[in-house]
Amino acid sequence: AVHQPGMTLLVPPIFWYEVANALWVAVRRQRIPSGIAEEALGVLLDFLFEEWDLDATDCLRTALRQDVCAYDAAYLQVAVDTGSALWTTDRRLAMAGEQLGIETEPHKPA
């Protein structure tokens, strides 16, 4: 799928903490300076992301049923709740999505 102007990307509330953690790891491993990490977060905040409120019980059930961690289940649950495609390059997550009838972009499980 191609990003289209004005498209809103739905994310679970954990998304921003995962982004911040990935940037922290990059700084800690001296891959990027802290100023770049802060700038990168600022750039992402300018995108049209919408947090989708999730039910923790639904996430746990999805995690147990699909044998994925609760963090990954949150992304699956957003797609299930909204009928949206799941954008991931994680093969295992894409396969779990396919089992739930979720369209996955850009990775399509074989």
Protein language model regions, located:
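Short alpha-helical "patches" and their helix-cap loops
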Residues: 1, 32-43, 91-98
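Short, well-structured N-terminal submotif of metal-dependent ribonuclease cores
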Residues: 1-14, 26-35, 100
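Conserved beta-strand segments of alpha/beta enzyme cores
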Residues: 8, 50, 103-105
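Acidic, PIN/NYN-like endoribonuclease modules and their adjacent C-terminal/linker elements
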Residues: 12, 76-110
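Active-site-proximal, substrate-binding regions of enzyme catalytic domains
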Residues: 20-48, 54-59
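Active-site neighborhoods of divalent-metal-dependent phosphate/nucleic-acid chemistry enzymes
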Residues: 46-92
